[in-house]
């Protein structure tokens, strides 16, 4: 390349750089400093801040160690599957780190005594029981914009009834009103959620679509907007009962990460939800310990470092509950083998019964 051509290229590059600097300067004058910046700049935090879900297995399945801050999360599933329990565990974990949490109880069904058993500090929990969907979402928007709330739970999307529906007659048809309300609210929320680093968790119910011949007939309420705006979508289902002789003492629960913008999705994790206790940490330590080859299983016996910890899963759980030092040691070993466990949790792009889930 000739000297003249080199000078021409350099001049063109300099002109482009000057034009870019002028554009950035104009944007900053119009919208304030920091309105545009380079992603790899010294002031930019690349690491995603997270809050634990209260389930070691689910933290691993999410790929980043918990639910991400500054994002919208959707938790959905059938009735009595553990949706509110999971949300309350996230609140409890955030409060342990000194965070402020709020609960918008549109269903008017929150049980304070159960929340306390899960580790929620009720004295520090903000709660609202709004009358209409518009009121609930306005309260949520105000709390997010304050920048002072770490976790905000809306329970549930299905209970966010538009005011026009409340004030109308029982048989009136309000086609698409709920979906429009959610779409408008999410458009307003999404920017302030990112700036305030608030985790906004929408709990949702499922409905059956009429006339579906092939594929999964299940869908979530509130239209499609939440499916697009949510960074993480988790499907939670009760897959069995835990019995003590003839008495049912808990649920076997399965969670599938249906959508994940921060790590590979479709991971499936199983854990126990015990009545009056919530997610069984000791049960997870045993199950994940076996998957990570930290805990050895020989027949019905479980052992760790040649020490027998119990015959049968329930006895092993009791042993770990009585020996917190060993439980902490096993947890540390499991976290070190998180990559191995993550591969073991990998599922396929279907729902928990193997049929494709609608995105």
Swiss-Prot record:
Query: What are the UniProt keywords, alphabetically?
Result: ATP-binding, Cytoplasm, DNA damage, DNA recombination, DNA repair, DNA-binding, Nucleotide-binding, SOS response
Q: Which InterPro entries match?
A: AAA+_ATPase, DNA_recomb/repair_RecA, DNA_recomb/repair_RecA_CS, P-loop_NTPase, RecA-like_C, RecA-like_N, RecA_ATP-bd, RecA_C_sf
Q: Where in the cell is it found?
A: Cytoplasm
Q: Which Pfam families match?
A: RecA (PF00154), RecA_C (PF21096)
Tell me where it mainly resides: cytoplasm
| SUPFAM superfamilies given in the database record | P-loop containing nucleoside triphosphate hydrolases, RecA protein, C-terminal domain
Recorded superkingdom: Bacteria
The cross-references to SMART domains, in alphabetical order and at most eight, read:
AAA
Name the residues that bind ATP.
77-84
Q: Which GO terms describe its cellular component?
A: cytosol
One Gene Ontology term from the biological process aspect of the record: DNA repair
Q: Which GO terms describe its molecular function?
A: ATP binding; ATP hydrolysis activity; ATP-dependent DNA damage sensor activity; damaged DNA binding; single-stranded DNA binding
Query: What is the documented function of this protein?
Result: Can catalyze the hydrolysis of ATP in the presence of single-stranded DNA, the ATP-dependent uptake of single-stranded DNA by duplex DNA, and the ATP-dependent hybridization of homologous single-stranded DNAs. It interacts with LexA causing its activation and leading to its autocatalytic cleavage.
Belongs to which family? Belongs to the RecA family.
HAMAP family found in the cross-reference section: RecA
Record protein name field: Protein RecA
Q: Which species is the source of this protein?
A: Paramagnetospirillum magneticum (strain ATCC 700264 / AMB-1)
Q: What is the lineage of its organism?
A: Bacteria, Pseudomonadati, Pseudomonadota, Alphaproteobacteria, Rhodospirillales
Report which gene this protein is encoded by: recA
